[in-house]
Amino acid sequence: AGVGGTGVITIGQLLGMAAHIEGKGIVTQDAAGLAQKGGATWSHVLLANTQDEIRTTRVGMAGADLVIGCDPIVTGGKETVMRMREGRTHVALNGHGAPTAAFVKNTNWANPSDACAAEIGKSIGVDRLAAFNADAAASKLMGDSIYTNPMMLGFASQKGCIPLRRAALLRAIELNAVAVDNNKAAFEWGRRAAHDWPAVERLLAPAQVLQFRKR
C-alpha cells in the first residue's frame, strides 16, 4: 500500500516474479484510487505453494498476513486497515508520509503519519508492527527517495514476513532490469535496517563539522 508513481505496483511484480522463480502459486492484482499517480495505490499479492490453492484475486477482509506499508497515511486508511486482523497481520511500515492535497487548502495541516502508525498498532498489536523512516534512509543512503519501496521490500524480507528466499527476490530485481544495482543495494539496506535500525539511523545523521581556530 502506498502512493501511485512511487513503485508500489513494481513491488507486487517483484514478489510475483520471485514466487514464479521458486515455483509457487501466485496471483497479483493492482488497485488504484481516483488518481493513479500521486493517489492511494495497492498491489494485492496472493502466494501459495501451488496455483490451485489460490481461489481469489484480492486479499479478503481481515485476510492479510503481511502489509508492506510504503506510506503510513494510505496504510492507515480504511481500505487497507480492513484487510488487517489482530493476531494474524504483520505490517512493515515506512514511517514517512507524503503530504496530501489537504496541505494545499490548509497551511496549518499537520502530517498524520504518527497517528496513522498508532492506529495500525492498535488494529494488529504493536508487536506485529515494524516501522522505520525508509524515505529518509533512501534519500541519504541511495541519494533518491525513489528507492524507498525496494528498501521496504528488503525490510519485510529480513523480518521474516515474506515466504520467499532472498536469492529469488534479488533475481526478480535483476530480471526487472531497471537500475538493478541500486535497487539491489536498496533491498540490502532495508535488510540492515530490519536487523539493526539504530545502527543504520546513525548513518543518516548530519556529519559533524569541526572548526579549528588559529592561535
Where are the predicted features?
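Active-site cofactor/cluster-binding pocket
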Residues: 1, 6-215
